[in-house]
């Protein structure tokens, strides 16, 4: 079959692409590539910024908590040493319980502590501090020699520290079984007690800085104990803002909670008695998942010897963690943990990324 010249010419023209299309398509593809690359780089840089910000924030919060622990717990050690030295030098007479209690009362007014105790080998006890009311200082005594029993008598005080009315009696007070006394006499040196709970509601957790006291012949006289209630540490953690939903908590190397920034107490009441709480059993999901991650990652909490910056995923979301050991010369060995969810920062990053992409698309439309 033969084609007429003009028919072939028309077919040839139909195969050619329009010049406008040839010019526009590469340009559009370049803009799409630029938009995609810009969005990717924006998101990537945003995530890098989140990493840096989360690390810096958790580091700053950890530093503040460590500094608070240094100052707060150093006070108890310092005071235990001062009182022990005063007894050694004969400046504080252990036989005059009322005078000793008044001296302790004055120290309570000066220092941020919970309770001051002195127990002797002959079961005499003298103390001053916060008892049932966290805002009122009481003085307390137990003296089998004078009273004929081991009952603990607690008195309210006036504004000068003089005892006023008797308001509580704790029957058969055996302080020698409590950690602050028993562990110190066994160690024979200045130590922190293990964390223990007072037997009165609301069952506050406490840790005590203790110093044994000896006579000139190196015979044990008794033990000076300075209680620090862990509620004061808890209150500090709640005041320190981590992030929108970030948390901070402190635990022992055995996994038991010391305090946290959540509203949860570090113990549960079971059949009327307090039972301390493992961080892995916390009702706060972020604290629980972080503690479980640390336990799984290290095998045991006591294997964490240095500060660590870590991250894990919970429900598909990254969680940034900083864990820092805190120790002192009297034997405390705690872990300070700060956890920051990625979502606390990504909302603004994602908004910025969306804005960048929209601007690029706007430029595409105008082009």
What are these language model-derived features?
Residues 1-17, 151, 262, 271:
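N-terminal sensory and localization modules of signal-transduction and trafficking proteins
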Residues 134-135, 160-165, 172-177, 187-191, ...:
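Intrinsic low-complexity, intrinsically disordered coil/linker regions enriched in small/polar
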Residues 222-229, 321-348:
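Short, hydrophobic beta-strand elements of compact beta-sandwich sensory domains
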Residues 13-48, 52, 56, 357-367:
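Extreme N-terminal signal-anchor transmembrane helix of membrane signaling/transducer proteins, especially
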Residues 41-78, 84, 91-98, 347, ...:
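Juxtamembrane membrane-water interface segments immediately C-terminal to a transmembrane helix
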Residues 17, 233-238, 341-363:
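Membrane-interface helix-start motif
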Residues 74-189, 237-240:
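Extracytoplasmic/periplasmic sensory segments of membrane signal-transduction proteins
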Residues 207-211:
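A short, aliphatic-rich beta-strand micro-motif
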């Amino acid at each position: 079959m033969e084609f007429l010249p003009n028919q072939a010419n028309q077919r040839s023209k139909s195969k050619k692409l329009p010049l406008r299309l040839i010019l526009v398509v590469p340009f559009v593809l370049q803009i799409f590539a630029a938009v995609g690359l810009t969005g990717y780089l924006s998101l990537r840089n945003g995530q890098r910024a989140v990493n840096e910000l989360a690390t810096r924030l958790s580091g700053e919060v950890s530093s503040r908590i460590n500094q608070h622990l240094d100052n707060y717990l150093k006070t108890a050690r310092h005071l235990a040493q001062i009182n022990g030295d005063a007894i050694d030098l004969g400046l504080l007479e252990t036989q005059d319980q009322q005078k000793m209690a008044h001296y302790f009362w004055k120290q309570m007014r000066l220092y941020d502590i919970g309770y001051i105790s002195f127990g002797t080998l002959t079961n005499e006890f003298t103390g001053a501090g916060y008892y049932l009311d966290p805002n009122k200082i009481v003085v307390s005594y137990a003296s089998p020699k004078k009273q004929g029993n081991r009952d603990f008598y607690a008195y309210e005080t006036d504004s000068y520290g003089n005892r006023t009315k008797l308001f509580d009696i704790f029957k058969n007070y055996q302080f020698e079984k409590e950690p602050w006394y028993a562990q110190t006499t066994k160690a024979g040196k200045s130590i922190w007690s293990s964390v223990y709970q007072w037997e009165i509601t609301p069952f506050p957790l406490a840790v005590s800085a203790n110093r044994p006291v000896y006579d000139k012949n190196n015979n044990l006289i008794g033990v000076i104990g300075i209680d620090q209630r862990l509620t004061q540490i808890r209150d500090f953690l709640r005041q320190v803002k981590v992030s929108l939903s970030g948390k901070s908590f402190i635990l022992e190397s055995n996994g038991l909670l010391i305090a946290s920034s959540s509203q949860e107490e570090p113990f549960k009441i079971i059949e009327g008695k307090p039972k301390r709480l493992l961080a892995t059993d916390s009702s706060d999901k972020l604290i629980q998942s972080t503690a479980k991650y640390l336990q799984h990652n290290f095998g045991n909490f006591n294997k964490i010897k240095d500060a660590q910056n870590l991250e894990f995923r919970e429900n598909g979301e990254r969680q940034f963690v900083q864990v820092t050991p805190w120790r002192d010369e009297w034997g405390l060995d705690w872990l300070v943990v700060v956890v920051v969810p990625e979502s606390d920062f990504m909302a603004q990053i994602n908004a910025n990324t969306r804005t960048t992409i929209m601007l690029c698309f706007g430029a595409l439309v105008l082009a």
